[in-house]
Amino acid sequence: MMQQTDAALAALERLAVHHSRFSQMYLERGLCHVARRDAPAAIFDLRSAVTLNPALAMGWRMLDGLYRMTGDLRSAELAAGHFAHLASLPPQIVHAKVLFGDGEIDVAEELIRRFLLEAGNHPEAMRLLAQIGHQRNVLDDAEALYEGVVAMVPDHDAARHEYVQVLIARHKFPQARAALEPLLKRDPRNHAHRIQAATISVGLGNFESVIPEYRAMIAEIGGDTHDARVRRADLNLWLGHALKTEARTAEAIDAYMAATANRPDFGDAWWSLANLKTYRFSAESIAVMRERLEDPATAETDRIHIAFALGKALEDAGDYEGSCAAYSRGNTMHRASNGYVPDVFETNTREQKRVCTPEFFAKRTGWGLDDPSPIFVLGLPRSGSTLLEQILASHSMVEGTQELPDIQRIVHELQGRELNFDKPLYPGALEDLDAAAVRRYGEQYIADTMPNRILGRPFFIDKMPNNFRHVGLIHLILPNAKIIDARRDPMACCFSNLKQLFAQGQEFTYGIEDIARYYKTYVELMDHWDAVLPGRVLRVQHEDVVDDLEGSVRRILDYCGLPFEDACIEFHKTKRSVRTPSSEQVRQPIFRDGLDQWKKFEPWLGALREALGPELAPRAA
């Protein structure tokens, strides 16, 4: 019998090399360790199984017994509770949950929808459908379903927690706070609830208050177990982000280093150090990153983060060839899994040009909300938009906010739920809107952005870069808004994007062909806006700002109808929260050093120059 168990374990070890996220493999491995009477190994694998797929009832049942046997009664009670909950559910729901947990989302959705049709509203079935909606990023459906679940079962804490997560994902921070209140009242010391409360505070721009809260939670986690180290690492990461945003850089570095000390393979923490842009890695840290990058046990997402961090470390050390190789490795890994389809943006651009013509806008003169308060700073990432935001936010009449999602939310509403990338509903849907609907969208934008306007100044900045795709919509619903296109040298911009690992989105930045195609289409679309809305968009070239700061500032303020203020020249002295990767750079005076940084990599950027073409990237004479 023992020989059979050993053979099974050997086979499962081979399977784990290629399928490290397969919950059933961990479950089977845990059962083999139970047969061998190896409780610690069994607990480790069974915990891995239920972490990957919480619907594995057998895993929870076995963990209950193992925890009791080893004297961990608190964990035993939690495992028993999970098992009892699953045992109380109809088998169709449990089956669908298992499928969902193993990534069989289409089958799980079909099964649970059929169950709901036959059995009527069941809170746990509705919750699973909401989870599927969240996974698919159909957040409006997920929100409605969770709202129904917590209305039916107000004390369903797990569903309420997930409901709050969806509200946070939709940037509905006041609503999220209200939904979270019952959880905080029932269990005020619960870390999961307190972390959500901190996330909401961050979303509302209140970074200062979360710093002591993160530190308190870190202090409350004792012991040296794997779980304790992971939790401390996560909290130190979030603490570092808050400190960085508040310009407390030295403390942020300490927090990020504490995260790597708790989890040496924590790619996000290594990248956060690199993403400060001003931090320099020690030889010891570089050695740790190299080791973890090559370790097969390091998760893929951590390897991606570490590759980008190593690229930055080697760049700062002057090893440009090694740096370029590390960046390329990170991009290749990320591109393999991000599912980016270049044709989608290009199709949308063609549709924007077809719909948004001079005649289209002429027929709608006088439409929209005449509120002049928004200042949109848009363009490609890494084009100097954070610098422009900092300059404008240094003015006494202008409030800096963040990259606001509210225009994109309107686009999603116009797009509808049935996405057809070959023939999208948006922007064609703009042709069907009447004057009242257009005005409502303008009012909706102003109302939705109001929670971010903490200082109450007359003007505010929306720095979402991708809004350049929606200049036509912005002009239609907010005809008096200001629109600034942040532009940068194509080679410098594209290479800077290839070096950057974004927290989310910007999937076009992980391949040379992708970023070059995107840049060319961006230029084509901005040329279109200039043609159909002449003078509407102010283009600001980053290199011009560096060469002539005062002249550029006066030009920007004049376009915005704002009087000149010296504070805009001394923008680096402005004390405000800055959330983007350039936060440390805009807290310093302007230097020319960064303009030609890409040229140090020029021997390895021939493919990028070729992809951009001679018009955008001419060879030096």
Give the residues covered by each predicted segment.
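Structural marker of alpha-solenoid helical repeat scaffolds
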Residues: 18, 52, 69, 85-86, ...
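Phosphate-binding active sites in nucleotide-utilizing proteins
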Residues: 367-476
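PAPS-dependent sulfotransferases, especially Golgi type II membrane carbohydrate sulfotransferases
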Residues: 271-274, 286-297, 306-374, 423-457, ...
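Register position in tetratricopeptide repeats
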Residues: 1, 35, 69, 101-102, ...
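Start-of-helix register in tetratricopeptide repeats
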Residues: 24, 58, 90-91, 124, ...
